[in-house]
Swiss-Prot record:
One of its GO terms (biological process) is spermatid development. InterPro entries: CapZ_alpha, CapZ_alpha/beta, CapZ_alpha/beta_2, CapZ_alpha_1, F-actin_cap_asu_CS. Keywords: Actin capping, Actin-binding, Cytoplasm, Cytoskeleton, Phosphoprotein. It comes from the Eukaryota. It comes from Rattus norvegicus. Exclusively expressed in the testis. Belongs to the F-actin-capping protein alpha subunit family. It is found in: Cytoplasm, Cytoskeleton. Component of the F-actin capping complex, composed of a heterodimer of an alpha and a beta subunit. Component of the WASH complex, composed of F-actin-capping protein subunit alpha (CAPZA1, CAPZA2 or CAPZA3), F-actin-capping protein subunit beta (CAPZB), WASHC1, WASHC2, WASHC3, WASHC4 and WASHC5. GO terms for molecular function: actin filament binding. The lineage of its organism: Eukaryota, Metazoa, Chordata, Craniata, Vertebrata. This is F-actin-capping protein subunit alpha-3. It holds the Pfam family F-actin_cap_A. F-actin-capping proteins bind in a Ca(2+)-independent manner to the fast growing ends of actin filaments (barbed end) thereby blocking the exchange of subunits at these ends. Unlike other capping proteins (such as gelsolin and severin), these proteins do not sever actin filaments. May play a role in the morphogenesis of spermatid.
Amino acid sequence: MSLSVLSRQDKEKVIHRLLIQAPPGEFVNAFDDLCLLIRDEKLMHHQGECAGHQHCQKYCVPLCIDGNPVLLSHHNVMGDFRFFDYQSKLSFRFDLLQNQLRDIQSHGIIRNENEYLRSVVMCALKLYVNDHYPNGNCNVLRKTVKNKEFLIACIEKHSYDNGECWNGLWKSKWIFQVNPFLTQVTGRIFVQAHYFRCVNLHVEVSKDLKESLEVVNQAQLALSFARLVEEQENKFQAAVIEELQELSNEALRKILRRDLPVTRTLIDWQRILSDLNLVMYPKLGYVIYSRSVLCNWII
């Protein structure tokens, strides 16, 4: 069905659904392509803002504020399309299409033991990320749910190269409650890759984890947490590489490749060229082939 015959409400749903399906690093490209089809600037701007806000949360889009990396996620959403950064103590809107911060406002935070723990965990996690991820980003957030304090650590590393026709994203999220003696860490590691040269190949791999950590003091907890993240991500990476190798050797070879057919047909190209009698119609702008050529080629 053509978009022109859809109601405005249905058209908004279609546009939104297509935009939120854009792979990491390809949102702006998808938006520009849809603009050529829709030709409604006001509608596209509104849907681009809404879908862009969701895209940032889904893929932990990184920013840089005052020289510090900030990862956008649904954990630091304040409402009304605004995000909050603990490091700079700023809230803002982010225009993904223009790659710009807007409506920046200052916000205070309560300096307590949990905020100090957040800073310590952030330092330990940053050391791990700098050691394992070239140009990787990380962030540690605080969140209170039903009077319970949680720390949320996010890691993101992407490689977007449209010139080479592929994009890739690695992200992980780790949540634990601030408890004495023992705490449980819940994590999720997610990898997505998109290759679009000659074929359109999407790969998504994820894993959920639960581990326990002993709590002695803040420094010990931060270091133990960083070691836990390193151990689990190393295991996940090794498993993904092994699975992809097996997939490449067996499944993809059977699915994407086939044996070439054996043919014993001999084509006499010299005969075809020598019999090629063309009738030119330059004013009409086209060429037709004589019947003898077609007969000789078919025989």
